[in-house]
Amino acid sequence: MLNAEQRAIIKATVPLLESGGEALTTHFYKMMLSEYPEVRPLFNQAHQASGDQPRALANGVLMYARHIDQLEQLGGLVGQIINKHVALQILPEHYPIVGSCLLRAIEEVLGKDIATPAVIDAWGAAYGQLADILIGAEENLYKEKEEAEGGWRGTREFRLVRREQESSEIVSFYFAPVDGMPVLKAEPGQYIGLKLDIDGAEQRRNYSLSALCDGKEYRISVKREAGGKVSNYLHDELKVGDTLQLFPPAGDFTLAASDKPLVLISGGVGITPTLAMLQAALQTRREVHFIHCARNGAVHAFRDWIDGLAARHPQLKRFYCYAEPEGGAAADAVGLLSEDLLAEWLPQERDVDAYFLGPKGFMAAVKRQLKGLGVPEQQSRYEFFGPAAALE
C-alpha cells in the first residue's frame, strides 16, 4: 500500500502527465522494445507507429494517478486492461520489465530535477500496487477459463477449416481445435487471441469473434489493413488446413441480459462483434434495431446474411447508410450517420440498450447523437482504448 506522502507525490505529477504523458510513454515503448525483444510480440507495431499505443498507455497512467485515492472508480478501465492482457497472455514475469522501463522513462523524460528519488520511489510503489492488482485479477481469469467447459490456459492448436470472402476488404476465418475437443463458448462481443509466426517473428493479435460460438469452432472476420502485417498475412498466406495457436476468448464489451429494445450501431469492420450480439438477441425474440454504416456496397460485409435474418425475424429492423455509394445494392441513406437518421431509425421510446463500435470519429459522433436523442448514457456501451475525452 502507498503511504500518504507517496499518494501526494503521485497526485502532484498529474499536471506533468497531462502535458507530457504521451512523450513519456513514447520514450518508454522505444526503450522497452529495443532492450527487451522478448516482449515485442505482445505489442502491435502498427499501433506503435501510429501513436495509438503510447496514447492509450498515457491515458491509463494519467487515470491511475488522478484516482490514486479512489481506485474503485477505475473499474471499467481495469476490466478492459485485464481482458486485453489475458487475450494476449501477459504473464507475471512481464511486469518487472514494464516497471523498470517506466521508472527509467519517468526519470529520463522529466529530468532528475523533477524526477527526484522521492518521485521515483512513489511511482515505483504505485506501479507495484497496480501490478499486484492486475496479476491477481488476471490469474483469476486465467484459472476461470482453464476450468470452464472447453477451456484452456495458454495456447491451443487450431486448424483453419474454412475461409469466406465477405466483402472486397473482409475475409472470415473459421478455426476448429486440432484435438477435436469442445471449445470454450465465448460471450457475444468477445475477441480471441492469435499467435502466429510471420517471417520468423512471433506476432500476437486480438480479433473480435464474428459469430455466436457453437462450442465447436470460432470465426473471426478480418479487414485487410494497408501495411498491416498480420491482416495481410491472414488474407494472402493462411490456407485451409494450416494450423496456428489461439488463446482463450476474452473481453468485457459483451451483451448484457435485458428485455429492452437493443440497438446495434457499427461502422466498417466494427460490425464484427455486433454479429454475435445480434444472433444472441434474436434467440430471445428481443426487438433489435441493427444500423450499419459503410463506404459503399462493395465493402459492406454480411449484408445478405443480415437481410436473410430480417426476413425471418420480424422483430429485427435493419438500416444501412453508405457514405460514398458506387452503384449495386442500395442503402437506406446516403452520407454520414446523423442524429436525424438515428431519430428515424431508433424506437420512439428511447429506453434502449445501445452498443456501438467503429472508427474513433464515428464513435464520437454516435456517442454524441445518442445522448442528444435522450438515450441514457449508462445504457450506451462501446469499446474504446483511448482517452474517454477523445469521444466527446
Curated annotation (Swiss-Prot):
Keywords: Detoxification, FAD, Flavoprotein, Heme, Iron, Metal-binding, NAD, NADP, Oxidoreductase, Oxygen transport, Transport. Residues 1-139 form the Globin domain. FAD binds at residues 191, 205-208, 384-387. Its cofactor is heme b; FAD. The active site is at 95 (charge relay system), 138 (charge relay system). The record marks 84, 383 as: Influences the redox potential of the prosthetic heme and FAD groups. Residues 153-256 form the FAD-binding FR-type domain. It catalyses: 2 nitric oxide + NADPH + 2 O2 = 2 nitrate + NADP(+) + H(+); 2 nitric oxide + NADH + 2 O2 = 2 nitrate + NAD(+) + H(+). The record marks 29 as: Involved in heme-bound ligand stabilization and O-O bond activation. GO terms for biological process: cellular response to nitrosative stress; nitric oxide catabolic process; response to toxic substance. InterPro entries: Cbr1-like_FAD-bd_dom, FAD-bd_FR_type, FNR_nucleotide-bd, Globin, Globin-like_sf, Globin/Proto, Hmp, OxRdtase_FAD/NAD-bd. Its EC number is 1.14.12.17. Pfam families: FAD_binding_6, Globin, NAD_binding_1. Heme b binds at residue 85. Residues 150-392 are annotated as: Reductase. NADP(+) binds at residues 268-273. Transmembrane segments: none annotated. SUPFAM superfamilies: Ferredoxin reductase-like, C-terminal NADP-linked domain (SSF52343), Globin-like (SSF46458), Riboflavin synthase domain-like (SSF63380). GO terms for molecular function: FAD binding; heme binding; metal ion binding; nitric oxide dioxygenase NAD(P)H activity; oxygen binding; oxygen carrier activity. Binds 1 heme b (iron(II)-protoporphyrin IX) group per subunit. Binds 1 FAD per subunit. Consists of two distinct domains; an N-terminal heme-containing oxygen-binding domain and a C-terminal reductase domain with binding sites for FAD and NAD(P)H. Belongs to the globin family. Two-domain flavohemoproteins subfamily. This is Flavohemoprotein. It comes from Pseudomonas putida (strain ATCC 47054 / DSM 6125 / CFBP 8728 / NCIMB 11950 / KT2440). The lineage of its organism: Bacteria, Pseudomonadati, Pseudomonadota, Gammaproteobacteria, Pseudomonadales.
